[in-house]
Design a protein with these regions (language model features):
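Accessory RNA-recognition modules of RNA-modification enzymes
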Residues: 1-263
């Protein structure tokens, strides 16, 4: 994958990018084989490879810059790095990021400044359903001071962006590296984003955990379903279940199974 920001030394989030992906997989397979060597009965299946770019269906963007010139991406030290064109994201994310920047300008949302402890908008969290192509957008704010402005201008954003299905505000008042706070305010009539893997519907709420690589997640869930198919299991507990991907796949098998999800 060719990444301008990585080559320029501005973003090192994909720290192994200089190593060819096939070589990365081979190294991981070798490490796994060494770890599993004491267990002679273990069968190691081939690794499931991911697409190298355009696969990440969730973006966590630090908002920096100013309300007139917002930057979505990361901070390299104290230097804002715009990752709106990051090749990890599907093609539909770039125009979405452009609309979000325009909305920040229109609503006058001041990015939070870490050193000064000033400003309101900390993060943008954007997710897309690969089943429908629809989006969920979350604004992570320091307080509710900008809530009225977001509500006022939301209709404009929805008009410009018909694929925006769910929009919410998360309040995170603490000055530390915490992604989100406990309070979530849903601003749209729709409060879930529907995804579908292997013909099984999954419903994402703003604060629920969900896999970011849709193709690999679908293969992972299908593998668990296949392995459990022959087991004489009548009850399934899905621990740290998130939206229930594993549990729902196991419960939807040909056997009658009672499912309990625990998050």
């Amino acid at each position: 994958m060719n990444c301008v920001e990585f080559l320029a030394g501005r973003c090192n989030s994909c720290s192994q990018l200089a190593v060819p992906y096939a070589e990365q997989l081979a190294q991981k397979q070798q490490q796994l084989a060494l770890l599993m060597a004491p267990f002679a009965e273990a069968e190691l299946l081939p690794a499931v490879a991911s697409e190298e770019q355009g696969f990440r269906t969730k973006a966590k963007m630090v908002v920096s810059g100013t309300k007139d010139q917002p930057v979505l991406g990361i901070l390299n030290g104290q230097t804002p790095v715009d990752l709106s064109a990051c090749p990890l994201y599907p093609a539909a994310f770039a125009p979405a990021f452009a609309l979000i920047k325009s909305f920040i300008q229109r609503a006058g949302l001041t990015p939070y400044q870490l050193e000064q402890k000033q400003g309101e908008l900390k993060l943008i969290l954007l997710s897309q359903s690969q089943h429908s192509g629809r989006f969920m957008l979350r604004f992570v704010l320091r307080s509710k001071n900008c809530l009225a402005s977001i509500q006022k201008h939301l209709a404009w954003l929805q008009q410009q962006w018909p694929e925006l299905e769910l929009c919410s505000v998360n309040v995170q008042p603490v000055h530390m590296a915490v992604l989100e706070g406990p309070e979530e305010i849903v601003l749209t009539s729709q409060d879930v984003l529907r995804e579908e893997f292997n013909a099984i519907p999954l419903y994402l709420t703003p604060q629920s955990f969900f896999q970011t690589n849709a193709a690999v997640a679908a293969a992972l869930y299908a593998t668990a379903q296949h392995w459990a198919e022959a087991l004489p299991v009548k009850k399934v507990w899905d621990l740290f279940c998130g939206v229930g991907g594993f549990g729902l796949h196991l419960a939807s098998s040909s056997q009658q199974r009672a499912l309990t999800g625990i998050e």
